[in-house]
Regions:
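Structural alpha-beta junctions
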Residues: 243-250, 306-315, 353-358
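Glycine-rich phosphate-binding loop signature in dinucleotide/nucleotide-binding domains
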Residues: 151, 274-277, 441
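Conserved acidic residues
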Residues: 155, 279-281, 314, 373, ...
């Protein structure tokens, strides 16, 4: 029988096989194994890579520019790849200037190969300098010319994204922080300098591609949507969960984003392009929806879930709202447990609806339809697939952060002092919860 072959860095390699004979290792001879036939995936055009991001936060590249080198695991067999970058200016947080972008790609250890944009070496992401006049039309979606393969499931693609602005500041290009476990890091310099860089700064906010596209036979490709709590931490809990489960995903985190924004005119701006290449959504929103009250939050969620279903989303996964009340050392308090306690009670009850409208928590009306729920103790309570979240579910990711179930009160060790934001330790705890939720649901 011929020896087995393993796929490494784009090549099939026949490993040496030895046997222990008389206390010595002896190589076993044999004929080389033929490389298995390459069969590209047959399926819809999807994002097939991990570690993607929509770009809408400020980058400060300096006068010469700055590049970020990121790593992305591929989850499809592909003859070629099409990379894309989605620019969504957020002028309220400094992302105001038009930003020049160049990019390169390689296999680990290889040479950087330049990517082109309709044959050109660079392209531009549109900025905008006024939050008051920003409209959903102020967006940029750029796609590189195809990058040739072939590529196998499990291969790693390294991408270097270089950005610059005329002033060296206020550019558009950051989504998520550089992660040493997944990325190479950042380096400043001209295009000629960054492609020969030997060392990178593996910290701070980084620029990354938004999609790696190819036909895919994967069960799901995910769009992740969040607010500042998806931007601020070194590793958001969504990144932890989806990276750990080896799922293709695109993270879109925007300071101040609410479910109400998606229910209004900003659906296409924030999610529309991703949903051309993703069939599933995970939402960590709700922090910025509290001002709408319980009924308003329910209406926003139901509107967004209906939009998702109309857009062809197979599953919407909704996380419960993070705590909103804190008891300080010495007895002081901040925030308010409501409407967090009430909206989470409704979500934990499967977000019951009757004829498309929110039903009371705990209703026993036989016409009520509930979503699948994953409880605080990892019990899966099956719901009705006709519920607006479709094949998705509601995941209780809040219990691990609050002092007791339904208290909406931050555990002291996770309180970031403003009741809205939370950082690395809390995200790590939630990330473990999300990993288990995804596993329980077959992902």
């Amino acid at each position: 029988m011929p020896p087995a072959a393993i796929h490494r860095d784009g090549d099939w390699i026949v490993p040496a096989i030895a046997m222990l004979r008389g206390g010595e290792w002896t190589t076993v001879s044999g004929s080389p194994a033929p490389a298995p036939e390459f069969v590209p995936d047959d399926g819809p055009l999807r994002n097939i890579a991990s570690n993607m991001g929509v770009l809408q936060n400020q980058v400060t590249p300096g006068m010469e520019g700055e590049a970020t080198a990121t790593r992305h695991t591929l989850y499809a067999n592909a003859t070629s790849l099409t990379l894309g970058w989605f620019g969504r200016p957020n002028p309220g947080f400094g992302a105001s200037q038009d930003t020049t972008l160049r990019a390169w790609a390689r296999r680990p250890g290889g040479a950087w190969a330049p990517l082109t944009f309709a044959g050109a070496a660079e392209t531009v992401l549109q900025g905008w300098d006024s939050a008051a006049t920003l409209t959903p039309e102020h967006r940029t979606d750029v796609y590189a010319d195809p990058f040739p393969g072939p590529f196998q499931v499990g291969d790693v693609l390294e991408v270097m994204t270089w950005v610059s602005t005329t002033t060296g500041a206020n550019g558009l290009g950051v989504q998520g922080r550089v992660d040493q476990a997944y990325d190479l890091g950042r380096v400043q310099g001209t295009p000629a300098e960054v492609v020969s860089a030997a060392q990178f700064d593996a910290s701070g906010p980084g620029t990354r591609p938004s999609v790696v596209l190819a036909p895919s036979a994967q069960a799901a490709s995910w769009a992740l949507i969040g607010d500042s709590n998806s931007v601020n931490p070194d590793r958001s809990y969504m990144s932890i969960g989806f990276r750990s489960r080896n799922l293709p995903h695109i993270l879109n985190g925007k300071h101040g984003l609410s479910t109400g924004d998606l229910a209004g005119d900003w659906w296409d701006f924030q999610l529309g392009e991703q949903l051309n290449y993703c069939d599933s959504v995970y939402s960590a929103l709700l922090t910025n929806d509290g001002g709408a009250g319980l009924a308003g939050m329910q209406d926003r969620l139901l509107t967004v879930w209906a939009k998702a279903k109309a857009a062809g989303v197979t599953r919407w996964v909704q996380a419960t709202k993070t705590p909103s009340y804190a008891v300080k050392e010495g007895g002081g308090t901040s925030g308010d447990p409501e409407p967090t306690t009430s909206i989470n009670a409704w979500l934990r009850d499967g977000a019951p609806v009757i004829d498309g409208a929110a039903a009371p928590t705990g209703t026993t009306d036989p016409d009520a339809v509930r979503a699948t729920v994953i409880t605080w103790d990892f019990q899966v309570i099956p719901g009705d697939p006709s519920h607006p979240v479709g094949d998705g579910w509601i995941g209780d990711t809040t219990y691990v952060l609050e002092t007791s179930l339904g208290s909406s009160t931050w555990k002291p060790e996770y309180d970031a002092n403003d009741v809205n934001h939370y950082y690395n330790a809390a995200h790590a705890a939630q990330g473990e919860v999300l990993k288990e939720h995804l596993r329980l649901m077959g992902f």
